[in-house]
Amino acid sequence: MRTPSLSLALSVLSLLVLGSGHYAAGLELNGTSSGKGEPSSGDHSAGGLVVSEVSTISEMPSGSELSTGDYDYSEEYDNEPQISGYIVDDSVRVEQVIKPKENKTEGEKSSEKPKRKKKGGKGGKGRRNRKKKKNPCAAKFQNFCIHGECRYIENLEVVTCHCHQDYFGERCGEKTMKTQKKDDSDLSKIALAAIIVFVSAVSVAAIGIITAVLLRKRFFREYEEAEERRRLRQENGTAHAIA
């Protein structure tokens, strides 16, 4: 009695191991039945009929599960697109990744959405230029010029001061003394006027002297001529009287 019970237990155990192996192989190889093992013939003893009956009964649920599992996975793999790939190892298969195609409805919805304006457009550049071209006289150099107006030259990027009247310097902090200039100018004018008057007086005196000398010479000649005529007349009168 012990030998048939031991053989029955061994056969059931072997069937369970074979069924689990077949199920795992079916999951890995996508429903291909490779290496299915048939149950061993076992012992041709008197208890062989009982073993075969028990094996058929125990095989039914495992076989149905295997068939349903193979059918489900085969349908799933049939529905999937055929993607080219390469096998690194017997147990690992590397396949390429393909981006899923967008539906037409999604594309239409995306096209219907209003286009947003880019921030880096003309408006953005204008704002940047405005920020760059901000006048530093209004903020940083507000109190730079003491007695003048701050002016920013964009081409040279230099801040200068336009000084008020009578002020000069980098920050218009120095003032010119008008009183000293007036005194100097008055003195110079007085000196110039005096020189002009002196020169004019000298010139007038010289002209007067020259004219006086010329007139004297002229009158002296005329006087001498008149005197000579008078003498000649007197001499002629005396001569006629003697004769």
Swiss-Prot record:
<dbReference type="GO" id="GO:0051591">
    <property type="term" value="P:response to cAMP"/>
</dbReference>
<feature type="region of interest" description="Disordered">
    <location>
        <begin position="55"/>
        <end position="75"/>
    </location>
</feature>
<dbReference type="GO" id="GO:0060750">
    <property type="term" value="P:epithelial cell proliferation involved in mammary gland duct elongation"/>
</dbReference>
<feature type="region of interest" description="Disordered">
    <location>
        <begin position="98"/>
        <end position="135"/>
    </location>
</feature>
<feature type="compositionally biased region" description="Basic and acidic residues">
    <location>
        <begin position="98"/>
        <end position="113"/>
    </location>
</feature>
<dbReference type="GO" id="GO:0038134">
    <property type="term" value="P:ERBB2-EGFR signaling pathway"/>
</dbReference>
<comment type="function">
    <text>Ligand of the EGF receptor/EGFR. Autocrine growth factor as well as a mitogen for a broad range of target cells including astrocytes, Schwann cells and fibroblasts.</text>
</comment>
<keyword id="KW-0732">Signal</keyword>
<dbReference type="GO" id="GO:0048018">
    <property type="term" value="F:receptor ligand activity"/>
</dbReference>
<dbReference type="GO" id="GO:0005615">
    <property type="term" value="C:extracellular space"/>
</dbReference>
<feature type="glycosylation site" description="N-linked (GlcNAc...) asparagine">
    <location>
        <position position="103"/>
    </location>
</feature>
<dbReference type="GO" id="GO:0008083">
    <property type="term" value="F:growth factor activity"/>
</dbReference>
<keyword id="KW-0339">Growth factor</keyword>
<feature type="glycosylation site" description="N-linked (GlcNAc...) asparagine">
    <location>
        <position position="236"/>
    </location>
</feature>
<keyword id="KW-0245">EGF-like domain</keyword>
<dbReference type="GO" id="GO:0045668">
    <property type="term" value="P:negative regulation of osteoblast differentiation"/>
</dbReference>
<comment type="similarity">
    <text>Belongs to the amphiregulin family.</text>
</comment>
<dbReference type="GO" id="GO:0016020">
    <property type="term" value="C:membrane"/>
</dbReference>
<dbReference type="GO" id="GO:0060744">
    <property type="term" value="P:mammary gland branching involved in thelarche"/>
</dbReference>
<feature type="signal peptide">
    <location>
        <begin position="1"/>
        <end position="24"/>
    </location>
</feature>
<protein>
    <recommendedName>
        <fullName>Amphiregulin</fullName>
    </recommendedName>
</protein>
<dbReference type="GO" id="GO:0014009">
    <property type="term" value="P:glial cell proliferation"/>
</dbReference>
<dbReference type="GO" id="GO:0005737">
    <property type="term" value="C:cytoplasm"/>
</dbReference>
<keyword id="KW-0812">Transmembrane</keyword>
<feature type="domain" description="EGF-like">
    <location>
        <begin position="133"/>
        <end position="173"/>
    </location>
</feature>
<feature type="disulfide bond">
    <location>
        <begin position="137"/>
        <end position="150"/>
    </location>
</feature>
<keyword id="KW-1133">Transmembrane helix</keyword>
<keyword id="KW-0202">Cytokine</keyword>
<feature type="transmembrane region" description="Helical">
    <location>
        <begin position="190"/>
        <end position="213"/>
    </location>
</feature>
<dbReference type="GO" id="GO:0005154">
    <property type="term" value="F:epidermal growth factor receptor binding"/>
</dbReference>
<keyword id="KW-0325">Glycoprotein</keyword>
<dbReference type="GO" id="GO:0009986">
    <property type="term" value="C:cell surface"/>
</dbReference>
<feature type="glycosylation site" description="N-linked (GlcNAc...) asparagine">
    <location>
        <position position="30"/>
    </location>
</feature>
<feature type="propeptide">
    <location>
        <begin position="25"/>
        <end position="96"/>
    </location>
</feature>
<dbReference type="GO" id="GO:0042542">
    <property type="term" value="P:response to hydrogen peroxide"/>
</dbReference>
<feature type="compositionally biased region" description="Basic residues">
    <location>
        <begin position="114"/>
        <end position="135"/>
    </location>
</feature>
<feature type="disulfide bond">
    <location>
        <begin position="163"/>
        <end position="172"/>
    </location>
</feature>
<dbReference type="GO" id="GO:0042327">
    <property type="term" value="P:positive regulation of phosphorylation"/>
</dbReference>
<dbReference type="GO" id="GO:0007173">
    <property type="term" value="P:epidermal growth factor receptor signaling pathway"/>
</dbReference>
<dbReference type="GO" id="GO:0005125">
    <property type="term" value="F:cytokine activity"/>
</dbReference>
<dbReference type="GO" id="GO:0030297">
    <property type="term" value="F:transmembrane receptor protein tyrosine kinase activator activity"/>
</dbReference>
<dbReference type="InterPro" id="IPR000742">
    <property type="entry name" value="EGF-like_dom"/>
</dbReference>
